Amino acid sequence: MKTFKYRLRPSKNQRTQLIHTLEVCRWVYNKTLATRKIAWEQEGKPLSLYDTNKLLTVWKRNHPELKGTHSQVLQNVQERVDLAFRAFFRRLQAGEKPGYPRFRGYGRYDSFTFKQSGFELGDNGLRLSKIGTVKILLHRPVAGRIKTLTIQRDVIGNWYACFVCEVEPEPLLVNDLAVGVDMGIESYATLSTGEKVPNPRFFRSNEKDLAKAQRKLSKARQGTLERMLRRRVVQHIHQRIANRRKDFAHQLSREWVDSFGKIVFEKLAEKNMLRNHYLAKSISDAAWNQLIAYTTYKAENAGRVVVTVDPRNTSRQCSCCGTMVEKSLSVRVHTCPICGLSMDRDQNAAINILGLGLQSLGIAHEAPASRHGE
């Protein structure tokens, strides 16, 4: 599956209809959630998706405005509630903090989905059932068989069409090169080849602008036009940061997938790492798991292999002889007292990560040569 995302340019009337559709979806979401919540609290059992689908027919009779939204769109809303409850019960059974599904407040529902019908992409634009033909900026063709279409609103009010398509894999030429990747803050990533990727620090580079905009927002009175405009400025800065971060991750993941047949990452528990208050902002800004996710799906389509491994001791262990060498974070060079290997500590970790990944694939890994006596 591959997603193709395009900007929409709805007219003023179409924008009103799109917002109305989101509000109808939000109502159905909250109504479905409330119904399932009551069933769970009073009877101790969950309602099925089939049960709530039947209720949708009753709701349409009592609320005629629901008929103005395509039936598949409303069914998908109930599927989202069902997924939220499945995740809730899965966490409950696993003994984790379950996190009960939440109701959506006004303006807190930002997408709706058509499943194979209710829309048509043509030369004149994107025709949406009950809404009309919306102008779409097709900067590249939609490839493959369209499975679903999601209409999405971002935080600053822009609209997008996201087509999920069934696309035939396009394998690249066979490539036996393998690389290990050590993610970091000083350098965004260090490869086992020794190459370093500088940290773009998208949030840090926009932090002053964001702080200034947030101060102005906090001074604006609640419910005023000024406050609404100030909030949009803040949202726009957040959106700009997110877009730059995504573009960077897409470009870097594409470069790696084109260059290597096997890519090994360390398995990162970002939630746990964010507990370090000194590094939390930098870790959040790096968004390493986003890069790993982008690399993984690109690799699957290209016939490449992505492996994640437990990074435990990869910074301490000598990649040449296996000796554990203790060093503080301030020490940037790995120097082994046993074999004499001396190299950048992050590259040493990346080589160890590569070794673990190849080992999991049943492939022998040649350690770097000792530099003892140099």
Positions of predicted regions on the chain:
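Positively charged, helix-rich recognition surfaces that bind polyanionic ligands
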Residues: 3-5, 16, 130, 140-145, ...
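Gly/serine-rich nucleotide phosphate-binding loop at the start of the catalytic core
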Residues: 1-74
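Long, hydrophobic, amphipathic alpha-helical segments used as structural scaffolds
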Residues: 33, 37-40, 85-96, 167
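Acidic carboxylate diad motif detector
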Residues: 50-154, 285
